[in-house]
């Protein structure tokens, strides 16, 4: 304790005599001179140094300092009335005598010998940075500071009058509050500063409500003297991080700091100071949070130092600035304030509940209109979003955030979790679920008018997995590559394309496929909505809308109807349809389209006629890709299901489409290694017609159409069979004429190449003339062969 210069004078201080002298002096108009007491350094003025302001090699331990400042109960009880006055009086005197040493300690910039001018001098520091931010301190607050701090205090009458008030307001059992808090205390009244070099510490009971101002303190750890103001920091490198306070302002602090015992500033861990790096005059959030999280709630003002070290890590609320608020009753803010009430009051008065809403000129209004919420600061922080803004209020930011959440988080599993919900619905088909797999509402399909000269179309993402436009609509620039130079590779016939990528035919087909899949998703939504919702009109409007969507897809495919009544059927080349089905994803689109069309409708007939016109394009070549093979087989299965629900008229038109097509259908036997999809669907047509004819489920017009369609198909089938037989005989180097006995190898080739299943399915529909033609062909080609007789049985 010798470094502080108080090792011997502390225990020898005549506290009782000092109180008597102070009482005698307080009645007169003379200035209070604390230097007359040895307790204040009368004998050791020159030798005393203010602890912590000079760099020392030795760091004082917590135990040593605590032992020197362990007062007796009698000493504390006698000196707590005097400690308010003599605390910073000696500090200011020391600073006035040695201004060069403490030139970096804050707003004290000039040296003055008059002690009465100190308080007024501290009130003219408007050029200093504002601790709480410039938006809180306005011109009105500065004006109030000047008026308040400029009041004359020429005697000790005012001080003497305030001492009993403190005793009344804060009796002995309640004196431990602010000693427990371990935070800086500032007063708004000027102090008569005697020449003294010793720093005393006020007892907890002598702190008035006017001193309990809401300036946040710097977090600390126990073990040394804690200085209450950042302006008196012994660390020069910490000054840029800790902006000086505006002394004399009732908004922030008073005119004098109070120093605390056994609370070191020089022993502060660097990690706590690093938390202050983001502090600037306009940012008070870090000050607020660290001040509240670092203050220990002591329950006894005379807590032993050993207990203080463990308690300093506990959070503690800030105390509101009450000394400057008119009409406030100090009794409301006694030592029994709870954490929630004190922190809530601080939150309400200084506006820390929402720093975003602070505007210039609002600091004075916050002092006049004070609210006292019942909930604490922690609850206030939880209710707010952790963001601050400079130009927008909290309500504006929260409204924008709410709109974003509505757009991206609809809380509808059908939209946000579409694929997962679809898998669950597929696995639990037929089960009674609490939440059905259906949309909550149906959206209108937007009109996507696209121009040919549009460089980049709009990509709209509806939800997870629901992309109306594919990224292929806006291809990546890396796809725009020039072909290799023909001269470099010696290929004179290879010429670079002149068309840009967005004008390539296959790109247009891919874009159409994506648009078509999106349209079919809309149809799915309508079906699920109709399934799980009861509508007043029975869903008539939605059914019409559904049919219109499906018809629009057929129109966009440019599918012509040969049986159109208006006679204005479109061309049957089906160019766009062929482009779409040439891609595997296009075949998936066709599969889904057929599954959604109502069976037996005209739209089903139109689409199936287009399919039967292009059986070779769909089933002519068998791909080596297993996925493509699977898709092709699934397409054949779906077509068979559609045929099973047709009437005789649509069946007749589909069979006529095969005969009228410019493409030769691949008439292969079932199980052919090169694909039997076309034969499968043709056999389904013949079997469905036989079933309808046996059931007499037809009319005269229907049976006539069927006879005409079958006659054309049978003629085509016989021509194909004869042509295939000739090719087999030529491959085996046999005479082209019908032989009486064919070899075993020729019989196997006929079975392997002839569409035997189609011939067998045609028997119920042939007439007598067609039967004679067929039997003549069989007798001449397979006469006497026992191996081929079971084929036609």
Curated annotation (Swiss-Prot):
One of its GO terms (molecular function) is mRNA binding. The modification Phosphoserine is found at residues 200, 208, 342-343. Induction: Accumulates in response to flg22 (at protein levels). Interacts with MPK4 and SUMM2. The keyword NAD does not apply. Residues 203-256, 292-312, 476-501 are annotated as: Disordered. Disruption phenotype: Serrated leaf and reduced plant size. Constitutive expression of the defense-related gene PR1 and enhanced resistance to the bacterial pathogen Pseudomonas syringae pv tomato strain DC3000. Residues 219-242 have a biased composition (Polar residues). Keywords: Cytoplasm, mRNA processing, Phosphoprotein, Plant defense. The keyword Cytoplasm applies. GO terms for biological process: deadenylation-dependent decapping of nuclear-transcribed mRNA; innate immune response; mRNA processing. It is found in: Cytoplasm, P-body. It comes from the Eukaryota. This is Protein PAT1 homolog. InterPro entries: Pat1-like (IPR039900). Phosphorylated at Ser-208 by MPK4 upon flg22 elicitation. Phosphorylated at Ser-200, Ser-342 and Ser-343 upon flg22 elicitation.
